[in-house]
Curated annotation (Swiss-Prot):
F-type ATPases have 2 components, CF(1) - the catalytic core - and CF(0) - the membrane proton channel. CF(1) has five subunits: alpha(3), beta(3), gamma(1), delta(1), epsilon(1). CF(0) has four main subunits: a, b, b' and c. This is ATP synthase subunit a. The keyword Manganese does not apply. Keywords: ATP synthesis, Cell inner membrane, Cell membrane, CF(0), Hydrogen ion transport, Ion transport, Membrane, Transmembrane, Transmembrane helix, Transport. Residues 45-66 are annotated as: Disordered. The lineage of its organism: Bacteria, Pseudomonadati, Chlorobiota, Chlorobiia, Chlorobiales. It is a multi-pass membrane protein.
Length: 338
């Protein structure tokens, strides 16, 4: 069975197609990613998740490598699939769509990303209407007040402090990315939920958006000549053969770092929680379940809530930092001085 959501060209095309509404100015992004399935037999083996598999998880895990073992069940919960599962009520298959050789199927992660986008639309729509009804001398309350604090935090502590002049034009993207990632992270912690940010194709697509925004912003701020001059870092022409490859590699390591950071942190958290739960099944001990699995799982679960906010903040902060570094004239001059 497949152990990871591998990077696939078809998946990246699918994600890009589904997130185009964000670039066209809609109120919230719709991101998508899913595992491109291999042979039908292998896929069915990975997708099987029944009451029997749950009940015998400890016995299979004890065997070490049997189908339905603890490791297989854990990976099954983390990986994407073409079905929504609501144990013990059953499994509901999702439609498969293939266009021009590209798999654009609706998957579990796609459904939860649509749900996150819907939540964003409803919340921001409600807050927007709330502000329309508030008089100039009145203070907002409830959700509107909380959202105002969030917007001010992103504006002052993230966008303005890292981008500087012209930060306003990047606020919609940064605010949307923060809330979108946060909602996705939290949806992965609810019962029957799925963590789309644990899919490397999703985090890669988000990072690619940051990459292109960074490069376009840098070209607009410095011009083509200034942008290309950055690649040489003000060094003597004899060193260009060394500096240019280093600078080009540096351009791509930034989105790579964003991709792996978010993907690894969210995936690791879910693996730890599920592993702690399965300790009691593997050891077949109620004592372990009461004094180890349950309390430690609750602790990690609460920690994951904090990590959900933290990772959304880090991704947004680094995105703003990369945009600011690419747009700042003085940043290039400082590099040239070195």
């Amino acid at each position: 069975m497949k152990r990871f959501n591998a990077i696939r060209i078809g998946e990246l095309v699918r994600i890009a197609v589904l997130v185009m509404p964000l670039l066209l100015g809609f109120g919230a992004p719709i991101y998508a990613a899913a595992e491109v399935h291999g042979e039908a037999g292998a896929h069915e083996a990975a997708a099987v998740h029944t009451d029997e598999a749950h009940g015998e998880a400890g016995e299979h895990a004890e065997g070490g490598h049997g189908e339905g073992g603890a490791g297989d069940v854990i990976m099954h919960h983390i990986l994407d699939s073409n079905a929504m599962e609501f144990e013990p009520f059953g499994k509901f298959p999702l439609p498969k769509i293939v266009i021009g050789g590209f798999d654009l199927s609706i998957t579990r992660h796609v459904v939860f990303m649509w749900l996150a986008a819907l939540i964003l639309l409803l919340v921001f729509g409600y807050v927007g209407n709330k502000y329309k009804s508030i008089k100039s001398n009145e203070a907002p309350g409830g959700v509107a007040n909380a959202m105002e604090a969030l917007v001010e935090f992103i504006r002052l502590d993230v966008a303005k402090s890292n981008i500087g002049e012209g930060y306003e034009k990047h606020m919609p993207y940064l605010l949307t990315v923060f809330v979108f990632i946060l909602v996705l992270n939290l949806l992965g912690l609810i019962p029957y939920g799925a963590s789309a940010t644990g899919n490397i194709n999703v985090t890669l697509t988000l990072s690619v958006f940051t990459f292109f925004i960074t490069q376009v912003s840098a070209i607009k701020s410095n011009g083509i000549k200034g942008y290309l001059a950055h690649l040489t870092a003000g060094t003597h022409w004899a060193l260009w053969i060394i500096m240019i490859p280093i600078e080009v590699i540096g351009l791509f390591t930034k989105p790579f770092a964003l991709t792996i950071r978010l993907f690894a942190n969210m995936t690791a958290g879910h693996i730890i929680i599920l592993s702690l739960i399965f300790i009691s099944f593997i050891l077949k001990s109620y004592i372990v379940a009461i004094f180890v699995s349950v309390p430690f799982s609750i602790f990690i679960y609460l920690l994951e809530i904090f990590v959900s906010f933290l990772q959304a903040f880090i991704f947004t902060m680094l995105s703003a930092l990369f945009i600011g570094l690419g747009s700042a004239h003085e940043g290039h001059e400082a590099e040239g001085a070195h």
